[in-house]
């Protein structure tokens, strides 16, 4: 008999969870203006809002924290981190930042000017926000297959080479760089193939452009290359990562995802001119170059986390849990972005709440219903997150409207996955009774989903 799969870790410490009543949750979400970001953590039973900074660290990471060097300049923990990053990516120049959006802010302050065009694959919210706040334009070049949530394609996060080439052929002089998000979060945590990274590199070289990877989940991307792309099944995760980054000129990183830490980020590049340009913005925005907004102990934990997560057993355990949840939804017939991604399951709200018009934000409505049902907090990745068009100020309804259920790393058991799936099934079973959604009563100009105020219709 073949032995079943089991996690690659055991539990040393636990945190109690609090259940609540349906009446409590109905009151709490109303007080939060129907914005799940405004809920207090003790009002949540299972938190699937994000996988960013919500994971559990290993005993090795905690041990490394005790050895953290808090020197303002020349911290030994920085050089330990730099050595690890260079070993995994091949990038020589490293600037730490307090998280991923800070890395974008520092690097884009150097590279993105008003009127610039930045093509890529479904820029995530902070990436798009940092581009558009500089009066520049993010152009989505994701493959069209990503728009069909029921289509089984192994690399739905890919850049469409024809779309990318068209942008460069027409407006190359306005393009400071190409950005590739690995994995493609907005499209459902979908991976980018190694072949596609080669194609992007070739197009970039043709037009003399550089390539940045938004690398928050680069280890998950490497795992999918190993399991889905021919020629990589016998490669280690570290070998695949090294090849992936060979097709890039630099990276921004939110270490709160695949770095397995609660806070941190960095910029890494092979180009001295990018490093020198970013330095000028790191010091006033983040801090000195050898800490950049991070404590020494956090840099030490990050170095260990990067090394741990680029081992097959660690990343496989993480992705197998997400696949377990997907299998439960398959059993219940609930539609989601297929195949399931690495960090989250993205429920197709347009296919679930078919009676709720897009103008009333089906994914946000589904997120509210799931919270009321069982205290499970998800996150809308759809029409609210898309913000308004910066020119017309109209809502952007052209993309997908998804409920993202992120799974924190090394935190929940499969019993929790069963609860999430059962709660979704309960909502799905009464989907035809849900005919109205929400309306916006207050919003900010950029990244409105964090603070938007809504009313239930």
Go through each PLM region and give its residues:
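Conserved PLP-enzyme active-site core in the AAT-like
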Residues: 2-34, 38-55, 61, 70-94, ...
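Short glycine/threonine-rich loop-to-helix capping motif typified by GTGT followed
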Residues: 192, 346-361, 390-396, 448-455
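Short amphipathic alpha-helical segments
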Residues: 263, 343, 401-405
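PLP-dependent enzyme catalytic core of the Aspartate aminotransferase-like
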Residues: 309, 373, 385-457
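Conserved glycine-rich beta-strand-loop-beta hairpin in the small C-terminal domain of fold type I
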Residues: 322-323, 337-349
